[in-house]
Amino acid sequence: CACLVGSEMCIRDRSKMEENKVMNIELTPEMFEKLDDSKKNSEKIAYESKTYIADAWNRFKKNKLALIGLCFLLVMAIGCIFVPIFSSYTYDGQNMANTFAGPSMDHIFGTDRFGRDVLVRIMYGGRISLAVGFSAAIISLCVGVTYGAIAGYAGGKVDMIMMRIVDALYSIPDMLYLIMITVVLGSNFQSIIIGICISSWMGMARQVRAQVMTLKEQEFSLAAFVLGASKKRILLKHLIINSMGPIIVSFSMLVPSSIFYEATLGFLGIGLSAPQASWGTLANDARAMISSQPLQVVWPILAICLTMLALNFIGDGLGDALDPKKK
């Protein structure tokens, strides 16, 4: 035992002596190497500062289908807006000597039973269909966000009463709203938008309410309340702003559904009256000739399908781009 203790003490003494030697080494300038300018930032972690929108756009661009859908929608919108510049034909100009003409250089999609250019009518119809879709979606967005945010933030009996009203309205089929409104107010642009809005805002209200109820218990919301922020400021500046991701995605899904509702009304014969034409009314006009002139039905239905597909691709891309969990 005594030998073991003695050996341990010797080892400790040697280690202390080595440490003292290291500490007593004199440092001179020749022992150091001057760092070059090229190596000064070698250990610096450099990254580009990006805003939330820029970061979301970079992720959105990586989704090829979403980017294709956006390009298609832009081309369709430009064509619908500037069709009078691109073509000398009008949507109601008739030429009875050139009815049911096939696709050609003069008439790319052919002509209808009155000799009207089908492509021009589809472009003019796209004006109405896209205008109805985006207008109804924007109004539904405003109503649904306001209603759902108030219900979610108020809570208690206010929330219960407001959401029971939504449940009661939600139990009625959407098409019944549309048919009732168009029958009462007439088949015009305004009545179709009102009918779509009445049937579309409730889903948005439910989603916003769920988001607000979750966010109002978060630390940043409670901190704003403790610091004396008003309820209006908390609701607008903190809760709704932090819910914009799901809101934008829902809005992108509202647009194709609104276009579909308008097209359904037109196909049922209770849409816009002639000579105005949307994609749905164009398909309805050609329905009687589906056996003899199938292309007359194919073109407007193809425009509806491609536009809705593009909008759904955009919605999926926005959902991935705005989701913080997928960064």
Regions found by a protein language model. Give the residues of each.
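Single conserved hydrophobic/aromatic residue that forms the stacking wall/gate
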Residues: C1-D13
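Gly/Trp-centered helix-boundary motif
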Residues: R14-V145, A149, G156-K157, S258, ...
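Short alpha-helical transmembrane interface motifs in multi-pass membrane proteins
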Residues: S38-K39, I128-V132, Y147, D159-M163, ...
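Loop-to-transmembrane-helix entry motif
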Residues: N63-L67, I122-G125, S129-G133, I165, ...
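Transmembrane alpha-helix boundary and packing residues in multipass membrane permease domains
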Residues: M76, A149, L178-V183, I192, ...
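Generic hydrophobic transmembrane alpha-helix motif, especially the helices
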Residues: I108, D112, V118, C142-G144, ...
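Amphipathic cytosolic juxtamembrane alpha-helices at the membrane-cytosol interface
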Residues: R116-A131, S135, G155-M163, M213, ...
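Glycine-rich helix-loop "coupling/hinge" segments at transmembrane-helix boundaries
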Residues: I181-L185, I196, Q211-V212, F260-A303, ...
